[in-house]
Structures are given as structure tokens and as C-alpha cells.
Amino acid sequence: PNGSIAPNFTITDINGESHQLYELLDQGKPVLLDLFAVWCGPCWNFAELGVFDDFNEVYGNSVFVVAVEADPTTPESSLYGGSGSIGDWTDVIHYTLANDDFIGDSSLYNLNYYPTIYLICPDRTVSEIGQGPSSGYWSIQTLAEEVFNYTCDPMTGINVGMQSYNSELEYCGDGKIEPIVTISNTGFETITALTIQTLIDGDV
């Protein structure tokens, strides 16, 4: 959902280059993620428009643009056409292109339709900025408005936040609580020490 923390992933594009989401975000660049399927008509129509290609040409130094074939039932070879694929996707997508089963086979990105387009900020928060047929009406201007209307907070020296919490939400005073938390630092400085305090009814 919007405002949640984007799960990390590593993809290998069709040129054999590996890209890890968090490493890209740590460079201070937002990531524009287009999740599509090779059999999806609206996905093909949108790709043919060349909006993402044009956006990448103009804003590629500020935003990392990537298209991922996310249907776990289709092999990477389907990107080049053949049975079950609308056509050769390398003819219509000229920015970073990959096939990845993990993204589509998990519920992490809540894929309910193709295409689904996410903007992921350097602080790892994710926003859905487009889906389905609506993206077919975009131009580079409207896409830029969609992207830059979502203001990503600038990276600071240290920016620590809790990414997940796994424990009981209620405590009746008996026994002990052993919470499991995941924290992340989206700043550009390394954390050398960290203190975590647990409060119960406002008391440490």
C-alpha cells in the first residue's frame, strides 16, 4: 500500500547486469518500476507509446527507470516474442528490462493487474502512481507530473526508521515481551551505535 516500505529485490536485466533496489535507492535516486506481463495488451500498448523511453531519456539521471516482466509463469525468452507473448518487447522497451519471477510470485507488491507502476523513494517508501488502462493516456509531461508530484524526502546524514515490528501488541503485565524489529537507515552516514527503548504505557 502507499506509504509502506518497499521490499528489497535483486533483478538481472536482459544484458546480464544485476540491480538491487536498496543499492539504487542508496544513491539518492527514486526508482520508477513498471510491472507488466508479456501477454498483456494494455502493457504492450503503453510500451509502444514510448512514454517511459522518453521519460528515461530526459530524466534518467535523476530517476532509475526499470520494466520488469512479473508473471511468474513466463520465461525470460518470452520477452523476445514467441508463444504466449504479444511481441518482441525489446523492440518497444529501450530502458532497463528484466524478467523476474519473485516479484510477481509473491504478495509483496500486491499485483492485482498489469501494468502496475510504482514510484519508490530513497527512504524506501512506495507509491502506486499508475495502473491498467489509465497509464495508456500518459505523455512524458503527465508522467513527469505524476512522478514529481510525489515528493521524496531528501537523504540526510542519518535517517533511522522502523521497517517492521513482530510481537504482541498487548501486554497484561505477566511474562515478558521479546519484540523483533527491523530498522533501516536511509541516510548516507553509517550508524556506529544504536539504542532502542521499549515503552509500556509510556514508561521505559
Question: Predicted regions span which residues?
Answer:
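Thiol-/selenol-based redox modules, centered on thioredoxin-like
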Residues: 113, 119-161
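Surface-exposed loop/edge segments in extracytoplasmic proteins
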Residues: 17-20, 126-128, 203-204
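A short beta-strand-turn-helix
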Residues: 10-31, 57-58
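Short, internal strand/loop/helix patches
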Residues: 66, 80-120
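Conserved redox-active cysteine motifs that mediate thiol-disulfide chemistry
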Residues: 30, 35-50
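Extracellular/luminal regions of secreted and cell-surface proteins that mediate adhesion/ECM remodeling
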Residues: 149-204
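Short beta-strand segments
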Residues: 34, 66-69
